[in-house]
Regions:
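Polybasic low-complexity intrinsically disordered regions
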Residues: 2, 8-11, 33, 94, ...
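Short helix-capping/linker segments at secondary-structure and domain boundaries
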Residues: 54-62
Length: 260
């Protein structure tokens, strides 16, 4: 599978540079971590996970036990049990986050920011949810109330990722903006949910022109035809959200169960 080979080569090249630096960081900060030897390398674990989001499988367990273990053993001869694989996925999280950051695109002078909800369970099951009980929060999006997290993205006009951040569901969309604009230049476009005079002023100090939609109860501000056209182009980020949720299976839509 050429695509799998390409993923592995790119990830493995990254891990060869990342792992010594990460180990040095842990030593310098005094963080104690018990690194248990594994038959699978970090690059193999990351490759399997990245390929999962391109596989079309609805859940990782079926993908790993019914597909990877049965059909990819010649690619990964030292496969571990599913339970052990889950532990390895947790251990490779720092490397995955760093790899994602390495894949960020370059700014083009035009950027868009938006957020989407990541539901962890149906609203009827909130009182019984335990997995993310300490992290997930109730929030409200365009589709109503939800329980979980928010995914915030900044993208350029070519669809390249510039910044990403995950927050609890009750965090205001405007709060993480200043932490996300380090790789942004020129104009940043957002919907009317991001309207904030103070935020616009702070971004202007960093050389970023922050342009948002206007709320119905606002005094109308003049806006150029170019900026109006760019605001209408924000659908590009909605397209990415749709791909992440429905093709890459960023999360599976929680379905209601019998509340009794």
């Amino acid at each position: 599978m050429n695509n799998l080979d390409a993923i592995y080569v790119d990830v493995d090249d990254f891990c060869l540079l990342f792992e010594p630096q990460w180990l040095e960081h842990l030593i310098s900060t005094g963080e104690k971590q018990r690194i248990k030897p594994s038959r699978l390398s970090s690059s193999e674990v990351m490759t399997i996970l990245i390929a999962f989001h391109q596989s079309g499988y609805r859940d990782f367990k079926t993908y790993y036990t019914k597909f990877v273990c049965q059909y990819w053993r010649h690619y990964f001869p030292d496969l571990v049990s599913y339970t052990r694989m889950l532990k390895l996925l947790q251990a490779t999280l720092p490397a995955l986050c760093s790899y994602l950051k390495q894949r960020f695109d370059k700014p083009t002078g035009i950027a868009f920011i938006d957020s989407t909800s990541l539901k962890v369970c149906h609203n009827m099951r909130i009182p019984r949810h335990q997995v993310f009980a300490d992290e997930a929060k109730r929030g409200k999006g365009t589709m109503g109330w939800f329980y979980g997290f928010k995914l915030h993205l900044i993208m350029n006009d070519e669809g390249g990722l510039l910044a990403v951040k995950v927050t609890a569901g009750n965090v205001d969309d405007r709060k993480p903006v200043l932490d996300m604009v380090r790789n942004v230049t020129g104009s940043l476009y957002a919907d009317k949910g991001y309207v904030s005079t103070s935020l616009k002023a702070e971004l202007a100090e960093q050389g970023i022109d922050f342009i948002t939609g206007q709320r119905s109860n606002m005094k109308r501000q003049p806006i150029s035809s170019w900026d109006r056209a760019m605001l209408s182009k924000r659908f590009i980020i909605e397209t990415v959200f749709d791909q992440l949720k429905n093709i890459c299976l960023l999360y599976t839509s929680p379905s209601p169960r019998d509340p009794t």
